[in-house]
Amino acid sequence: MTPLSSPLSQYWQTVVERLPEGFTETSLSAQAKSVLTFSDFALDSVIAHPEWLAELESASPQADEWRHYAGWLQEALAGVCDDASLMRELRLFRRRIMVRIAWAQTLSLVDDETILQQLSHLAETLIVGARDWLYAACCREWGTPCNPQGVPQPLLILGMGKLGGGELNFSSDIDLIFAWPEHGETRGGRRELDNAQFFTRLGQRLIKALDQPTMDGFVYRVDMRLRPFGDSGPLVLSFAALEDYYQEQGRDWERYAMVKARLMGDNDDAWSRELRAMLRPFVFRRYIDFSVIQSLRNMKGMIAREVRRRGLKDNIKLGAGGIREIEFIVQVFQLIRGGREPSLQSRSLLPTLDAIAALHLLPENDVAQLRVAYLFLRRLENLLQSINDEQTQTLPADDLNRARLAWGMKAENWPQLVGELTDHMANVRRVFNELIGDDEADTPQEEERSEPWREVWQDALQEDDSTPVLAHLADEDRRQVLTLIADFRKELDKRPIGPRGRQVLDQLMPHLLADVCSREDAAVTLSRITPLLAGIVTRTTYLELLSEFPGALKHLIMLCAASPMIASQLARYPLLLDELLDPGTLYQPTATDAYRDELRQYLLRVPEEDEEQQLEALRQFKQAQLLRIAAADIAGTLPVMKVSDHLTWLAEAMIDAVVQQAWTQMVARYGQPAHLDERQGRGFAVVGYGKLGGWELGYSSDLDLIFLHDCPMDVMTNGEREIDGRQFYLRLAQRIMHLFSTRTSSGILYEVDARLRPSGAAGMLVTSADAFADYQQHEAWTWEHQALVRARVVYGDPQLTSQFDAVRRTIMTTARDGKTLQTEVREMREKMRAHLGNKHRDRFDIKADEGGITDIEFIAQYLVLRYAHEKPKLTRWSDNVRILELLAQNGIMDEHEAQALTVAYTTLRDELHHLALQELPGHVAQTCFSKERALVQASWRKWLVAV
């Protein structure tokens, strides 16, 4: 055993003062002295439980003692009579065994692979023990869940990630997926439940038993986000639902996660065999699967971008060359070749590395370096976490913990440890970079082309200087370019740029100037790019990105030249520069039906309990997607209707995620309203009005939302902090508004306007569905019924969605007096025009002025309210284009007029989109769009001017 280093010997004196009664400095072994000096977690634990220290002093932990965990836990749970005592015993058992593992690990009594195995077996033992106790308790309360043939149904638990691979780290959270075999009902209990309800309640109690902090701490943080549909999906799924999801909707990244999935308790019963057989074809294809390469390349890009974005230099898991990159390297081969090569199907990393070597998929030396690096990094990670039983992978900044880690890793001192770590991570990064290579490099021709621009950049030319490379520019443009360069250099003098930053900038700028100044709009483009560069000069990683990836630089120049809005976004949020790396995704927005899944995958990388990082991630995802939509718009690959479709689908995905976050936070605090025990869903809906409801969002549109619930009176929540159910939904809506509007370093998510709710700003923020129906039928104004034409549920369970749709249909199909309706709609429009329109006397406001977009919207709304009682099909859609189609199909409007209004409407909206990209207001010269305006005005007179 290595003697304690000088700083640790000094710290031992502090430990001596805290030793439990009955133990003295002289009575303790050298082993105990080392462990208690190294780990505050171990010290705190034995102070609270001195018998654990006596136990360890009398007999050291053994490598194979994990085989006894299940028996030891069974003894500990023998006297448990309720959930509270179960939670206490689970927490004490976990702490006791973790002290034993920390002891063995610190002293190297057991090799590092066995430590990972012990940590994983401990977690599995606790999960299975808690499940089995709670299953029996739930059966006593509600009966045993059975299939239609009367066969009892178990809860099967898939351990994912490091837990599934038998490689859990010291203070890890656990990723789980719950499943049960077949539908049916409980039998033999005081009341009958269907199996879905039974297993959901069991799952909730199991998570609480493991996850909820008490005075004894918690057992494990439980993360359920890897299940189908993530947080928005059922907590527990039947085999049929699982199979359907993975066959029809399973994504490549879910295959990636499922490689390590392992059944907890791992019984060889028929149900377990069936579940394994069902999942195997999804994970491992029977052929060599090169189709997954692009998906893996995208994952690799995501990893590299996250390293850049979060500046994870001291993170041994997520940083460049860290644990995650080794895991990725191994899983690349598993996903591509695992179907054909059974030896690659191991859930554990090290056996898979051996198989990669045996199959000659990587050079022997690379495999050897990866193995050594992996074991080094995993030991370092576990030692780091065992100091305080804290889930961290970030190297410490304080001298004491640095001294501890250097001693634990058998290094002379901290600098030596950092040197060894740097070498290992560099080896990993090299293999990672060479895998699925997609890096770019300058060609000799590009180098030659940029060489003359070094003079322009480095020699600080004056406005009146002449230089051959600027000769093609007009005098004014040349002066502007030189002024911009000079001003930029002055700005740089004020910034604390290190030597590496200066070096990269000097390498980048000649290339950038060569590309920018070859354009006719060189001065304008450069004026948009220099603010962005000024914002990132102290962040060398982003300069390196533009310098090392010429393609990214070209896309930056093209997009900034095309749109000052994009230039402003990139300057404000430089992490968006990562999006420029892959033109395949930059100009191809996410498929409209895939935004939710992409966002779910994006959020999985952020700890669920880290609310601040969750807020940042939502905003970053939105900005990246917005950039891709705008890039496709500029490139002409998205017509106006599709731009709005994408912006709307994106907004719906964000709403879904925000509601999930708010719901999770509220339920953690109060439990959920008790009426939900008897039904599926959350009893909550978000209704989108206006542009969101009508699939017509623009780049800077806010969201018009109202919130509905179906909670009866006098219902309470079922948590420890019990509140009224309706109060719960009010606080939920307030939380949603807060999550949307909180300003982080990445800005706000969306401006949200909830004033279209019943009684407007004076009304309750959230309304019961019954109260909403009553208000619409008896109190709402005509303009509120007009707004309802463009309303639809954008988040909600089927029950509430059907209820809202029925109310909307009833209101819209109510017979109205034609003259009265015509007058009210026309007068409302005149009021709006007086308030909003014609502010720029010599300009045409595309939206608000006569003959503009709002007139078309009012015509469509009027005709739906006027004729829907005769033609109920008019209520089907909430967007103007399809409403105009319906009006023609149902004989209300002449087909030629409907088509002409549609063309006018899409033309005007297209112009608004492009004005937004140019950061210009929504008005143009009076001479513009005269044909469209005349057509709209004629239609207005036909329908809404009294005869």
From Swiss-Prot:
Name listed for the protein in its UniProt record: Bifunctional glutamine synthetase adenylyltransferase/adenylyl-removing enzyme
List, in alphabetical order, the Gene Ontology terms for molecular function in this entry: [glutamate-ammonia-ligase] adenylyltransferase activity; [glutamine synthetase]-adenylyl-L-tyrosine phosphorylase activity; ATP binding; magnesium ion binding
What the entry lists under PANTHER family is as follows:
BIFUNCTIONAL GLUTAMINE SYNTHETASE ADENYLYLTRANSFERASE_ADENYLYL-REMOVING ENZYME, GLUTAMINE SYNTHETASE ADENYLYLTRANSFERASE
Question: Which intervals of the chain are annotated as region Adenylyl transferase?
Answer: 450-947
InterPro entries tied to this protein = GlnE, GlnE_rpt_dom, NT_sf, PII_UdlTrfase/GS_AdlTrfase
Give the UniProt entry's GO cellular component terms.
cytosol
Q: Which cofactor does it need?
A: Mg(2+)
What exactly does this protein do?
A: Involved in the regulation of glutamine synthetase GlnA, a key enzyme in the process to assimilate ammonia. When cellular nitrogen levels are high, the C-terminal adenylyl transferase (AT) inactivates GlnA by covalent transfer of an adenylyl group from ATP to specific tyrosine residue of GlnA, thus reducing its activity. Conversely, when nitrogen levels are low, the N-terminal adenylyl removase (AR) activates GlnA by removing the adenylyl group by phosphorolysis, increasing its activity.
Q: What is a biological process (GO) this protein takes part in?
A: regulation of glutamine family amino acid metabolic process
Under SUPFAM superfamilies, the record lists: Nucleotidyltransferase, Nucleotidyltransferase substrate binding subunit/domain
Please verify whether the record's keywords include Acetylation.
no
According to the record, the residues making up region (Adenylyl removase) are 1-440
Enzyme Commission code(s) on record: 2.7.7.89, 2.7.7.42
Please give the catalytic activity noted in the UniProt record.
Answer: [glutamine synthetase]-O(4)-(5'-adenylyl)-L-tyrosine + phosphate = [glutamine synthetase]-L-tyrosine + ADP; [glutamine synthetase]-L-tyrosine + ATP = [glutamine synthetase]-O(4)-(5'-adenylyl)-L-tyrosine + diphosphate
Keyword annotations for this protein?
A: ATP-binding, Magnesium, Multifunctional enzyme, Nucleotide-binding, Nucleotidyltransferase, Transferase
